[in-house]
């Protein structure tokens, strides 16, 4: 009986892990449909969103549009593209603000707001769930470097 109980718990635990993985949405980096930016590396995306760079590789200004704290899309984006958790990100920006070296990107409520801001400004860059991409924005290929 003990074996069956343990096996059942193991299967249940596996199902929970699989379910949470499947629930995570694919997050993509987006720019305005008219933006000349064609691709970025993961490091370039991280540098723009962490305040280490305010320019695209072409030299044009890059204006990052963030999503609000606590957003699952935001947490997924920063984990995948910068390797930082929500707590690490908060600590990062606290340090940057305290030393006077910058401010975090403007944050909007959701993917629809990100698209609205980006569609009107070809210098903007943001992130949304892949299923939210439409004709107003273009998903950028991001090289894993």
Regions flagged by a language model, labelled:
Residues 13:
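The feature marks either
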Residues 1-6:
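N-terminal secretory signal peptides that target proteins for export/translocation
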Residues 26-145:
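Exported/periplasmic ABC-transporter solute-binding proteins
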